[in-house]
Amino acid sequence: MFGYHGKILVVDLTSETSHWIDIEKEHLRQYIGGVGLGAYLLFKFSVPGSDPFDPSSPLIFATSPLVGTRLTTSSKFAVVSKSPLTGFINDSLSSSFCATELKKCGCDALILIGRAKRPTLLFVQNGRVDFLDAKYLTGLTTAETEKTVKETLNDYVVRVLAIGPAGENLVHYATISNDGGRHAGRGGAGAVMGS
């Protein structure tokens, strides 16, 4: 189906493993766009009644079929989770090259489940996921984190999705920063990422 890979990357932070799953074309047609796809995946992967900070509550980064095209405003991705502010579904959009890079990895969505045992930097490249120690990033602002990751990897075009002290401390309205100051800024997705 044009605009989709039909693939979802699922990363289990607890076991530090990842795997790919296929998504049926009918679901891609029915739940179009990053928010629609993310909402479908949230309901599919969530445990009913779970707390937003529970390891069983997924954090989903989803793209639309237009990501990677030359269409204006097509570089948006949706971050979908349960909101720590409301306890209900939350979607937050951000526009950046992170959306394009996610699509270039060959997936339509990235699902994070579980809880990391230590501060962890996920490095996703060419369909491979590496779990790197990120203790050295703890306490840094999002701008400092992005700069430090790029310097550490010696890759100044790598895209970074980061939380700062607010997300680390589970502030219920924390954001996820990316691409030098763009944010997925609604509903506390940064706190979910920090949990």
Q: Could you describe each region identified by the protein language model?
A:
Residues 99-100, 104-195:
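Active-site cavity-forming subdomains of large catalytic enzyme subunits
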Residues 60-62, 78, 111, 123:
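Short, conserved beta-strand segments within well-ordered enzyme catalytic domains
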Residues 3, 18, 66, 70-72, ...:
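Extended catalytic cores of very large enzyme megasubunits
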Residues 68, 75-87, 91, 167-184:
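A gly/ser-rich beta-alpha-beta helix-loop segment of oxidoreductase catalytic cores
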Residues 1-40, 44-45:
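N-terminal basic/disordered segments at the start of proteins
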Residues 22, 61-65, 133, 164:
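Pocket-edge structural micro-motifs
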Residues 95-96:
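Thiamine diphosphate
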